[in-house]
Amino acid sequence: MVKLRPKQCGRKQRTYRIVAIESQSRQEGKVIKEVEFYNPRREETQLDILAITTLCGSGVKLTETVCNIFRRATFKIT
């Protein structure tokens, strides 16, 4: 099963990329598609709405963390 989940980037100042990844693979595993960038320090979110809708239409599940990020986001469409 494929899920949208956060992938950590950076060591000291954490940022996250929301990626479509196989649920059985490890956190830093092979990414199928990258759909979002999230910076919790600046509350900055950049989304690719078209990619998210096509992935969700094809059966990709959202993790609870990603759902919370979507709810809090001030959307910048890329």
Curated annotation (Swiss-Prot):
<dbReference type="GO" id="GO:0003735">
    <property type="term" value="F:structural constituent of ribosome"/>
</dbReference>
<keyword id="KW-0150">Chloroplast</keyword>
<dbReference type="GO" id="GO:0005840">
    <property type="term" value="C:ribosome"/>
</dbReference>
<dbReference type="GO" id="GO:0009507">
    <property type="term" value="C:chloroplast"/>
</dbReference>
<dbReference type="GO" id="GO:1990904">
    <property type="term" value="C:ribonucleoprotein complex"/>
</dbReference>
<keyword id="KW-0689">Ribosomal protein</keyword>
<dbReference type="Pfam" id="PF00886">
    <property type="entry name" value="Ribosomal_S16"/>
</dbReference>
<keyword id="KW-0934">Plastid</keyword>
<keyword id="KW-0687">Ribonucleoprotein</keyword>
<dbReference type="GO" id="GO:0006412">
    <property type="term" value="P:translation"/>
</dbReference>
<dbReference type="InterPro" id="IPR000307">
    <property type="entry name" value="Ribosomal_bS16"/>
</dbReference>
<comment type="similarity">
    <text>Belongs to the bacterial ribosomal protein bS16 family.</text>
</comment>
<protein>
    <recommendedName>
        <fullName>Small ribosomal subunit protein bS16c</fullName>
    </recommendedName>
</protein>
<dbReference type="InterPro" id="IPR023803">
    <property type="entry name" value="Ribosomal_bS16_dom_sf"/>
</dbReference>
